[in-house]
C-alpha cells in the first residue's frame, strides 16, 4: 500500500490550562527553583509529544518548545547576546536568557515585534558584531529526550538562517551575505550533530520565502541549502514556508532539499495554481499545509480531500506529506476543555488536537481510500453544515444594515484643523499633555475578585462595588501624579478584545482557548462565529463613574474593528471585511452612547492594524482601505469637539503613515521605546498634521526607567514632531505590570515631562 505521511509543524507551548505560563511566572517570582521549572516544563513537553504519538502523527516536531520564543532560542544557540547583558561565553544561563527578553535594572530588554502577520511576538536578534558559535544544540537535546523518554523519532525544528537574519537588526544589505556566511558553518554544525545522532528528518522554517522580495535573493537560499546538502547528505531537510504563497515557486521547489513545505490555506489559491503550472520535482516530498493552523474552525474535510486529490495528480502519494498550514502555536490546545460551549459552536471548532485528528483522517483517506474514513467525514460534514445554517450565524437585521452602508456617513463633519480648535478650547491642556494608554495593573486581588464573581462566590453588587473602589483609587493616583487626561483603568476587563466579545452578539468566549502572545503572556481570543450586533452598552457605566470622580477628562476606551478581527478567531464563511464592518456598526453605537453620557475623549485602539497586513504588498491596498473604512465607520458620527484617540503597537510605520493619517483620529499614540528611535525617523521624513504621542518608556519590562532616559526619548521625538502636536504617554497599557513599578515609572514620566515643558516654555518666552 502506498502510504501518505502525516506531519505536524509545531505544538502549543502553553499547556491545556496554561501550566507553562504559571511555571515561568513562579520561577520569575522566585517561588520555584530552576530545577523545578525544568521538571515542570519537561512534563508538559512530553505530554504534548505523547498526544501526537498516540494520534498517529508520523513526523512529530521536537525543539518547537521554548521557554520564551523560538527566535530568541536561535540567538542564544549561537551566542548572539547583546553586550549590555555581559555574557562572557559558554552556555547562556536561563537568567541571562530571560534578561534579554525582559530586561533588568542595568540593561534594557531586546526589542520585541510581531512574528510576520500574527499576534505572536519574537525577540529581535541584535546582529551588530555577530560572531556565531554553536553554544548549545537544543535541537539535538530535544530529539534525544523524545527518543529516550517516548521512543519517538522526532523531527527537529530550526528557524532557518535567512529568515533569522532577516528578522534581526544591526546589519545592512551590503553586509547581509557576509553575515550569512558566518552563520552557515554554525548551522552545519547543528545539522552534522543531528545526522550523527541518527535523525532522519529536520524541519527548517523559512517563512521569509512567503514574503515579497527581489528574485536575486533566491541565490542566497541556493547557497545555504546547497551547503547543507553537501555537509549532511543523509539528512532529509524539509524546507518549510507558511503564511502565504511563494512568489518564486519554480525556483523554491528546485532548491536542494528533500521536501518543500507549502501553505495551501493562506495562499489565496496561488499554490495549487503554481503546482498545476510548473509541476513538482518527482524526487522531492511535498509537505502540503492544508489544515488551517491559524484559525479554530472545523475543516470542510470534503474540500480538503478534493484539494489533496488535486495535489496528488502532481506528487506521488508516498511523497505527499499532510500537515497544518503552519505551527499550531497559534491556536489553543484542545476543544475538550470547553464542555460548556453551545454544542452547535463546539461542533464547528477544531483546536490543535482536533487539527491533528483532521490531518490523520485526511492521510488515511489518501492511503486507504475515502471509505476508510466515511464516518469521520460525515461527522465533519454535518457539524459544519449545522453551524453555517444555524441562527447563530445569521442575523437578518445585521445583514440589512451592511447592505445599507452606502447611506452611512464615514467622515467627520469638520476637517481636523478646524475641529482641533474646538477640542483645545474646552480641554485647555498644557504643552505636552500626559496620559496613559488605558489599563492599570490587575493585582492578585483584582484577579481573585473577578474569579470569585465568575464562580458565583460573590454577588454582582459586591463585584461592581469592588470595581468602583479600584477605579476610584486609581483616579486618585492619577490626579496625585498630575496626569492630564485620565483613564478608568479597565479593571472590569480581562482582555481588550475578549471583553467586547462578551458584550456583542456574534461572539463567544472560551474558558481555556488561550494562545501565546509573548513570553508568558497569553491571550484568549473570542470566537466570532456569527453576525455581529450591538446589544447593550459596553463601557459606558465604568467610564461615566470614573468621570464623576474628577474634573479632568477621562477617556472612554474601546477596541477598534480590525484589532478585534486580528485578535479573534473569525468565522471563515464570509470575508473578514464584512465582519469588520459589522463590528464597526456595533461600536459606532457604543461611541455615540459614551458621547451622550458626557465622555468627550474617546480612544478607539487599533494596535493590531499593521500586524494584519498581508505579507504580499500587492494585497495591502484593499486591506488598508478596509481598515480605514471600518475605523471611520466606528468614529465618524461624534461631535466636532469630541476628541478621538487611537493607539498602535509594535510596528514599522513608515510604509503605512498615509493610512494612519487617513484614520482621521485627532490623537494617535504609538509604541516606540523598544525600537530605540527607529519609528521617530519616520516622522522626520514625513509631515504628520495631527497630534501624536510616541511611547516614552517600555511597559513590557519590569524595569523602572530613569527620568533622564525618558527625557532623552522626549527630546529625540521633539526633533521630528512639533511641540504643539506632542503628547507624552507610556508605550502601552499597564495591566501586566506591578503597582509599585507602575507608579514609580509614571512619577518619572511626569517629572521628565514637567522639566522638558519648563524648558520649552522658557524658550517660547
From Swiss-Prot:
| Positions of Zn(2+) binding | 647, 649, 671, 732
Cofactor(s) recorded for this entry are: Zn(2+)
Q: Which reaction does it catalyse?
A: 5-methyltetrahydropteroyltri-L-glutamate + L-homocysteine = tetrahydropteroyltri-L-glutamate + L-methionine
Instruction: Provide the residue positions that the database annotates as binding L-methionine.
Output: 437-439, 490, 605
Could you tell me the superkingdom of the organism this chain comes from? Answer: Bacteria
Q: Give the keywords, sorted.
A: Amino-acid biosynthesis, Metal-binding, Methionine biosynthesis, Methyltransferase, Repeat, Transferase, Zinc
UniProt binding sites for L-homocysteine: 437-439, 490, 605
Gene3D superfamilies, alphabetized: 3.20.20.210
* GO aspect biological process, one term: methionine biosynthetic process
| Presence of the UniProt keyword Methyltransferase in the record | yes
Top-level EC class: transferase
Q: State the active site.
A: 700 (proton donor)
What function is annotated for this protein?
Catalyzes the transfer of a methyl group from 5-methyltetrahydrofolate to homocysteine resulting in methionine formation.
Question: What NCBIfam families does this protein map onto?
Answer: met_syn_B12ind (TIGR01371), PRK05222.1 (NF003556)
Similarity remark:
Belongs to the vitamin-B12 independent methionine synthase family.
Q: What is this protein called?
A: 5-methyltetrahydropteroyltriglutamate--homocysteine methyltransferase
Native species? Listeria welshimeri serovar 6b (strain ATCC 35897 / DSM 20650 / CCUG 15529 / CIP 8149 / NCTC 11857 / SLCC 5334 / V8)
Gene coding for it: metE
